[in-house]
Curated annotation (Swiss-Prot):
The keyword Chaperone does not apply. GO terms for molecular function: asparaginase activity; ATP binding; glutaminyl-tRNA synthase (glutamine-hydrolyzing) activity. It comes from Pyrococcus abyssi (strain GE5 / Orsay). CDD domains: GatD. Pfam families: Asparaginase (PF00710), Asparaginase_C (PF17763), GatD_N (PF18195). Residues 92-422 form the Asparaginase/glutaminase domain. The gene is gatD. SMART domains: Asparaginase. PROSITE patterns: ASN_GLN_ASE_1, ASN_GLN_ASE_2, ASN_GLN_ASE_3. This is Glutamyl-tRNA(Gln) amidotransferase subunit D.
Amino acid sequence: MRVDEFLKERNINVGDFVRITKEEDGEEVTYEGYIMPPYELSAGDTLVLKLENGYNIGIALEKIRRIEVLERAKVKPEVHFEALIEGKPGLPEVTIIGTGGTIASRIDYETGAVYPAFTAEELAKAVPEIFEVANVKPKLLFNIFSEDMKPKHWVKIAHEVAKALNSGDYGVVVAHGTDTMGYTAAALSFMLRNLGKPVVLVGAQRSSDRPSSDAAMNLICSVRMATSEVAEVMVVMHGETGDTYCLAHRGTKVRKMHTSRRDAFRSINDVPIAKIWPNGEIEFLRKDYRKRSDEEVEVDDKIEEKVALVKVYPGISSEIIDFLVDKGYKGIVIEGTGLGHTPNDIIPSIERAVEEGVAVCMTSQCIYGRVNLNVYSTGRKLLKAGVIPCEDMLPETAYVKLMWVLGHTQNLEEVRKMMLTNYAGEITPYTRFDTYLR
């Protein structure tokens, strides 16, 4: 039996508050919560119940012994948000570009429903506070998981951002899944030339139907940062585990450093640009950010997609490098050990790659610190083989940058010059010890 049939037979509706008794390990266990609508990936014979603590559980229909309705779903009168949506004179205009995820959705605990938010009215229902900061214009560009994001999506986002900024918007927010947000932030940092206004990427670590969700505060802070004087690509996410402030990170220096913590995003080898409080207070943590200007944004979207990111590990085979060369890859970014090393027995394959015109760049899997190939003999051999040391660039940033560089030239000397040119703050001029694990 399917969930819809099960509920219909018992005159139970989505949003009803129920008590379910089920069999579990030979004993009866009772749960109370709201009946949730089935979603795309849920099993047809599993009932989803939202507990009062905000978490969802799935209960197989065959395990249910009793179900009773404690309270019927409340039917709310239709609420309109025209006043918010129409905007207020004098407020700046900010476009929010949606690419996927649940950053702007909110649970209605009286009905059990989750509101996805990407029309203006849905955004007003979910996070009305942002309409007090700016006249918000939402646009859903596409709706994909961030792990499915490809370079072609970066290009589309870049063009949509430039279109909004060049049409008069004060700033742009890009709502994005967190898993690959750092890659997209780096790509936009290189593609958006002459940037004169803020571009803010924002996501949520906790889904919006959980009481610990960070979605609303992140979105509020991101809109506030989009109206600031900072003309850079930034990532705005929780600055610590509580709901006190968010941090604005430079798009080329930010990395997701935890699978689930709300403050998972950190600036690496650098300090964040600013702290943002939901009430509008902004504390700038550095002065060397690009300032707002009237320049027209240009999109430089020439990229070479045949670039690989390879992590060194004990026992790595030179066949991996050979395979990439034989398959026509134009660039390889290596996450080396320590200061930027590889086993000696794969250096001949790296040398062959360079001889055949493949750009090989070195980063460190330590994440913190700087590549230095002059300290040990292995590093000096890699330099002699033609490897380009990427200073303190994040591996993900170096990967995106090499794509962008190879889109402009495949002359290895020119590639070297461009990889070592600091275009968007991706290279810190000196090693900062005060940024380690902060």
